[in-house]
Amino acid sequence: MLESSNPIFEKKNVIVTGGAGFLGSHLCERLLQEADVICIDNLSNSNIQNIDHLLQYPDFEFIKYDVNKPMDLDQFEELDKFKVKFQGVQEIYHLACPTSPKNFEQLKLNSLWANSSSMISTLDLAVKYKAKYLFTSSSVVYGEPTEQRIAFSENDEGIVNHLSTRGCYNEGKRFAETCVETYRQVYGLDVKIARVFNTYGPRMKLRDGLLIPDFILNAIEDKDLVIYGDADMEFSFCYISDMIDGLLKLMQTGPEMSLVNLGSDQVYKISEVADMLIKMTNSSSKIVYEAPLSIFMHKGKPNLQRAKEMLGWIPLVRLSDGLRNTIDYTIANKGMVEMNGDHPRLYR
């Protein structure tokens, strides 16, 4: 197993790719309590406003860069304060990947690159610095649930149509996991794969086709909440703070722990969530049903036995509390969203 011999002068140096995105910005925020944080993002599908409040901290540095390309940290003078040339990097969280249902077709190649080129680029960085490496994969690697199998465990191989409309993302995540595991086998890297299930909370992109924020926006505007499917469709929802706890706990484990499901194992009917949001926003919106869209995919729930036993992790935030926080954020930031007319409400 590769182990870094570089001295840690004050705090460990941690890279977060996709750090200006939804998950990444919350992760950077939490890591600042214990580390020097190098946030890397090309802002192609994220928002600098997510990390505006972090730019003031001396232990935080934002670098606009496309990690699909090889990266030489020595070329960035702004990282001299972290003594990267001498201390190196201790941890890499690789989160960068476009996930925009609204712009899914336009971002297909970006998704392909994120699950291939950027994997090699960031894994090569981990080899150079002998850094621990965590990749955020997705529940899509399991394929769709069946009547016989609703909850997925880490040993389930899954069935994914690699030539489907979603193949660049779904099969892309499977290939990305293969990259991670291959680097472990060849270089002895201490690598982690988090299979992330549906996650929600403040800083999700608004008007981008994501279920919870679009439901909230439509509810506060008294517009119809459109469910693409039937009233019995179910999803699990994990609040962002719980997900960040899980990622941090996973990174803290030794090389014996390399793969885990993170998400909520409690499912709700989409119609129930829509009804909750209508009531919580005192909305006059109606729930309507339409045929599923071409990129829609049913998703199962995670079996969390490994997360509970190996990480001591379970999601703690109640759905009602998480939705309230997300509603408050959405109302506060609604005016910052440019209104370009209606577009379909999709599911990630």
Listing of model-derived features with the role each one plays in the protein:
Residues 1-197, 325, 332-339, 343-348:
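N-terminal Rossmann-like NAD(P)+-binding domain of SDR-like oxidoreductases, especially those catalyzing
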Residues 175, 179, 183, 215, ...:
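Hydrophobic alpha-helix immediately C-terminal to the catalytic Tyr-X-X-X-Lys motif of short-chain
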Residues 243, 247, 262, 273, ...:
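Non-catalytic, hydrophobic alpha-helical segments
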